[in-house]
Amino acid sequence: MVTTHNLGFPRIGAKRELKFGLERYWKGESSRDELKALGAELRRRHWHDQRDLDLAPLGDFAFYDQVLDMSFTLGNLPKRVQDFHGDALDNYFRVARGRSAQSAEEHAACCGGVAAGEMTKWFDTNYHYIVPEFHADTNFSLDPSRLLQQLAEANAQGVNAKPVILGPVTYLWLGKAKDVSDRLALLPKLLPVYGALLDTLTAQGVEWVQIDEPILVTELDAEWRQAFRTAYAALETRRIKLLLATYFGQLQDNLTLAASLPVDGLHIDAINARDEVDALVRELPAERVLSVGAINGRNIWKTDLNAALDWLEPLAKQLGDRLWLAPSCSLLHVPVDLASEEKLDAEIRSWLAFALQKLDELKVLATALNEGRDKVADALAANAAAIDSRRRSPRVNNPVVKAAIARIDAQLGNRASPYTQRASKQSARLNLPAFPTTTIGSFPQTAEIRQARSRFRAGALDEAGYRTAMRAEIERSVREQESLELDVLVHGEAERNDMVEYFGEQLDGYAFSQFGWVQSYGSRCVKPPILFGDISRPKAMTVEWIAYAQSLTRKPMKGMLTGPVTILNWSFVRDDQPRAVSCYQLALAIREEVLDLEKAGVRVIQIDEAALREGLPLRRAQWSEYLKWAVESFRITANGVQDDTQIHTHMCYSEFNDIIASIADMDADVITIETSRSDMELLDAFDTFKYPNEIGPGVYDIHSPNIPTQDHIVGLMKKAAERIPAERLWVNPDCGLKTRQWAEVIPALTNMVAAAKTLRNQVQ
């Protein structure tokens, strides 16, 4: 009999209950006990949703991040919070998001509070984790309370639970040494704590533990491979059964290593690594379980169940009880329940599967394998009809768009003149001071903005009333910026709910969900649009709003657009054509908007590519192909403008050392990047690579409520000036200010502008 299980379930709740609960707690509107009760209720509900599984995950729920949870389980707290006492949950949030100075005790780090932990992308997804911090003298100590509490809850609910933990080698690999020490040197101190954790779970009657080691799908050198052998040899003596889980890619040169590790089962992502299944069957010891991730855990399209059974049935005959079935990865990356989508186009809806529907698909596959296809004939027939409907739909294919793609040539992405010539023309037109100040685009999405949008979408506010409300918010943003004496202004994006969804709503080839939320980090959720067909732009999308904002000020007003690569990487993308083709389609559509903004007199146009790095394949050998079409797509979008129009781009959560040449090849006049959490470490790339254009290193962390001091910002910019000529530096926050409050934004920007004025006097 095939065993079904799941690697992880979305933790935010079908209606984002966790998000709202966290925000109430952070604002002091609810108690710690109320937040903990909400977590328990969500876990209870999610285990109920997974009741048909043979094994349900435990420990996949986190109040902020599963990697941060593992750091606390291992007793690895950053030194700056180790002296704080009180409830562990407050320390947890100190690490996750920082804390504004509320007492003399907390006035400890930069910005008048506790510096938040560094945050970066979880592999090639749009989820973010808090980076573990290591020092040569780091020690570990077990705190199993979180897992034991959840295990008690699961037992009380009658759940056959499988605890999920991050493996020791991946944990070290994901972290960062805060000194010159080697992370792997900590492995001997870390392994006994893992062993103690497994012993603790064994004593509680746990049979299986899922231990995630996703770095096995990346390129590992000999030292890291040996770390796997060392780690699992040390854990082999435990009486508990280990399911080693890999996902997000192929094992390739790590396949033999993974198959040889002394564990009881191995999970493989059969969406990305289906071709490796046969090799694993040959290499795995005869008694070992092979868990096959046959349902895509990262996209929302229905699985072709009949096609899946065609290759799973021979495998089931060969492996028998050793075959387990699961999604390819945790379902954290997809929305919770398609049944909530009452307004989604019925035809498109029939092509989709969210987390609960993916578990239904898993059940159909297992039933067919265990009892025969006849037992689920109706479900298989309905699935086949949906797959065929999508394949044949004329809504998916647009001959006009395909013809435009065929006409793309090498000249389409080139500016008329090189940067040095453009810069002099832009300087004459814009007349900016040294260290010009700007923001990244968005200002706080206030309760009034959200209420107006909600009433407009519900039909309680007509279009004229909505436009009046948004214009008032834009005017407020402009007046605040002028009062702050910023140099290049933005309109604040009051009319935009999300930087990708806003554009997707206005492009043909996109569809939108009501409740298709996924977690990005902490309480931050995104609702990716659904790219189901060929992309085109029926009409201008932003010109009216930007032109209105420009009419309110003599200062330059940035046109704000999301770039094609980011729109692609932050969407649920069709899987019936190469991603590069969809990206080129987006590039042509956004290019039309860029040219319309220029015609409207907009002098500065920002094209955000926040997610450029996120699309990089996990293996470097595949980077060049991705970067070629990603950079070309940006250039097609941006480079049709005149020399005196200044093109900005923004990137966040990015490390630049290894892709700096490609970023330079984008040829944006100004690039703004996130650097504050890494204390300008990202600028190390510029020690050896002479970046030719202008750059704005982010000077304060917008993900934290902490207010940066003027001196702190001056210090960061002086570090930047050691690498980048001062005449090519801009001063700006790390990212957009959408998630902050005006009460935080005003003092932070006041200090930022004051710092820029100080720099103009100090740095020649």
UniProtKB/Swiss-Prot annotation:
Gene3D superfamilies in the cross-refs: 3.20.20.210
Presence of keyword Nucleotide-binding: no
Pfam entry (one): Meth_synt_2
UniProt xrefs under InterPro entries: Cbl-indep_Met_Synth_N (IPR013215), Cobalamin-indep_Met_synthase (IPR006276), Met_Synth_C/arc (IPR002629), UROD/MetE-like_sf (IPR038071)
SS bonds (residue pairs): none
Biological processes per GO annotation: methionine biosynthetic process; methylation
Molecular function via GO: 5-methyltetrahydropteroyltriglutamate-homocysteine S-methyltransferase activity; zinc ion binding
Catalytic activity: 5-methyltetrahydropteroyltri-L-glutamate + L-homocysteine = tetrahydropteroyltri-L-glutamate + L-methionine
Domain of life: Bacteria
Listed cofactors: Zn(2+)
UniProt: L-homocysteine binding residues: 440-442, 493, 608
Cofactor note: Binds 1 zinc ion per subunit.
Enzyme Commission numbers on file: 2.1.1.14
UniProt: L-methionine binding residues: 440-442, 493, 608
Residues engaged in binding Zn(2+): 650, 652, 674, 735
Record bears the keyword Amino-acid biosynthesis: yes
Function summary: Catalyzes the transfer of a methyl group from 5-methyltetrahydrofolate to homocysteine resulting in methionine formation.
Protein name: 5-methyltetrahydropteroyltriglutamate--homocysteine methyltransferase
Lineage: Bacteria, Pseudomonadati, Pseudomonadota, Betaproteobacteria, Burkholderiales
Gene name, Swiss-Prot/TrEMBL: metE
